[in-house]
Amino acid sequence: VMDVVIAGAAETDEIGVLPGHSTMRLHVEGARNAVADAGLRMTDIDGIASVSAPGPIQVADALGVRPRWIDGTGVGGTSFLLHVRHAVEAIRAGHAATVLVTHGESGKSRVGAARGAFPASSPNAQFEVPYGVTGPPSMFTIPLLRYMKEFGLTAEQLASVAVAQRKWAARNPRARYRDPITVEDVLASRMISYPLHLLECCLVTDGGGALVITSAERARDLPRPPVHILGTGETFESPLISQMADFTTSAAFRRSSAEAFAEAGITHGDVDHLMIYDAFAHVPIYGLEDLGFLPRGEAGAFIAEGHTEPGGRLPMNTNGGGLSYTHTGMYGMFLIQESVRQLRGQAAAQVPGAEISVVQGNGGMFMAAGTLVLSNRRA
């Protein structure tokens, strides 16, 4: 099987609040940075993957690329993990040689941003919004409350997720928030949607990034150390929160991660570094359990005991995560960027000797899941 790698990776020059940057400008800036990082030119790109709006064709046109393969898969924040998976398949099939995956989002400033509300004709708008499920915070609290009741997760354990990730952010000069926080600080912050406090909810920022994906053979001539894509997974559940099979676990997380681990041929003990989407503080708890790192009901205590923070035995969300680093609305691109930095040995808060990193994303609440197993060595 052809070895496919990430040969270039970069974010926009700035992330945070960028009122002078449109969504398209963020796409273009991240794309140019990633192509330069790979030591390539735009003329070397023959595949584009991007979430609309603006979409892959519009992004390609803005970059002066005439692709022979595109992917516009849009399933929320995990879309970029699926783009990587699809790019691997396209390169192996000969549909493209070098694929550029782009992201740009004016999540805070809303410059050129698409409307984010549920369309009136959608099942969500018809069957859930009338009962108070009006957006991500109120959607996510439904499974969280059930999990807390069933497994005894405490408010303090939930708050410890934000505390752990702020410790990583304190080591990252690009992180939006770096000041230390305590469990008490989290619980004293404003209630957003019970039981989630402000500091347990993701940031709302502007920014973007891009990835260059190609064969390992081609990457031999490029300047950056390649990051090998050992395994990928994707799967889906209902977009309706009410239709989850079990509020205390994500079936999509379980299936996508099992597929990626099997393809990569790794065990949980092989994993040195972990990035789990954290739009809200409980998602990494679900991730640790649904990916099989811990038995159900134990992840809250595991995080509260410090095992995922600097110096812990399972470093997780080492850029500070969506809770402290950045979160433009669709955060998955930034998960991958941090894994690439770790595997290149270039991270602000570097995990010593990291060789295998697992990236887990979700989209549309727990509707969609994508998993990547990445490494700085071949399988």
State the predicted function of each range.
Residues 49-102, 106-139, 177-203, 234-239, ...:
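Conserved catalytic cysteine-centered active-site region
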